[in-house]
């Protein structure tokens, strides 16, 4: 039996004024190639109504959540607000997933949604809030490495600690982790590039394995997520 993995989607207002929901096909291709079935949810769907048929969930990247803005309300120059319907849906899903037993992988904005929902905080703009930051916004193609991260590793083992190039591109990031969460990878300026909950069931990364199929760290994490999903499915089927 193939595992069913849920996805959130983006909301975009076209030049014509028409509002559409969409998702980069590379996300679903990634899951199909790993033997899964993508189940794609538009904004407004309540997780408690549909999640019983899922074996895992993948929170995709996107623009900036209004919830990430500082208490002062100051809006960074690089701020690109995600559509309000998407923000509401993403944070509903993230809150529900944190309380569930589903394996979860969040990429870029998906990582930030999980941290916000679990009680963490976000830098609204790295360049204006972090001292001496490195370049986190990629200037070239999306599949190209942008900087190096220091990987700390999972408690259970697997890929050992080391340095890896990743195709990260973002101007926001996790500032403080939710209680008991821990850093999996970070950059030389201290920015968190990957983290997990205490059980290592919920994983978030800032970079994009869907854009680069050759990048080893992202695909180690993706393969581990798929293994967790399959293990859960086998237990449910036993």
Regions found by a protein language model. Give the residues of each.
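N-terminal beta1-alpha1 cap of cysteine-dependent amidohydrolase-like domains
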Residues: 1-105, 116, 123, 127-157, ...
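Active-site loop->helix "elbow" adjoining a glycine-rich segment at hydrolase catalytic centers
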Residues: 107-111, 118
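Active-site glycine-centered loops adjacent to acidic/histidine catalytic or metal-binding residues
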Residues: 108, 170, 208
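Short, catalytically relevant binding-site loops at active-site mouths
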Residues: 111-113, 132, 173
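The feature captures the conserved acid-bearing segment of alpha/beta-hydrolase catalytic domains
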Residues: 169-176
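Short, Gly/Ser/Thr-enriched beta-strand-loop segments that form substrate-interacting elements
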Residues: 181-189
């Amino acid at each position: 039996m193939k595992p069913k993995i849920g996805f959130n989607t983006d909301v975009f207002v076209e030049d014509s004024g028409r509002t559409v929901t969409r998702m980069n096909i590379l996300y679903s291709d990634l899951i199909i190639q790993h033997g899964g079935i993508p189940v794609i949810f538009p904004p407004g769907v309540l997780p408690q109504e549909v999640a019983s048929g899922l074996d895992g969930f993948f929170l995709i990247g996107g623009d900036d959540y209004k919830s990430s803005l500082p208490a002062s309300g100051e809006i960074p120059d690089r701020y690109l607000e995600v559509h309000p319907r998407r923000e509401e849906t993403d944070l509903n899903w993230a809150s529900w997933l944190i309380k569930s037993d589903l394996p979860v992988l969040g990429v870029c904005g998906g990582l930030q949604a999980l941290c916000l929902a679990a009680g963490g905080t976000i830098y609204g703009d790295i360049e204006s809030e972090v001292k001496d930051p490195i370049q986190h916004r990629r200037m070239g193609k999306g599949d190209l490495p942008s900087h190096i991260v220091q990987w700390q590793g999972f408690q259970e083992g697997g890929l050992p600690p080391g340095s890896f190039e990743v195709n990260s591109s973002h101007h926001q990031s996790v500032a403080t982790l939710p209680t008991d969460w821990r850093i999996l990878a970070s950059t030389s300026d201290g920015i968190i590039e990957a983290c997990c909950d205490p059980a290592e069931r919920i994983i978030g990364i800032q970079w994009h394995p869907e854009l680069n199929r050759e990048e080893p760290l992202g695909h180690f994490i993706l393969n581990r997520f798929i293994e967790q999903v399959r293990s859960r499915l086998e237990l449910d089927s036993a």
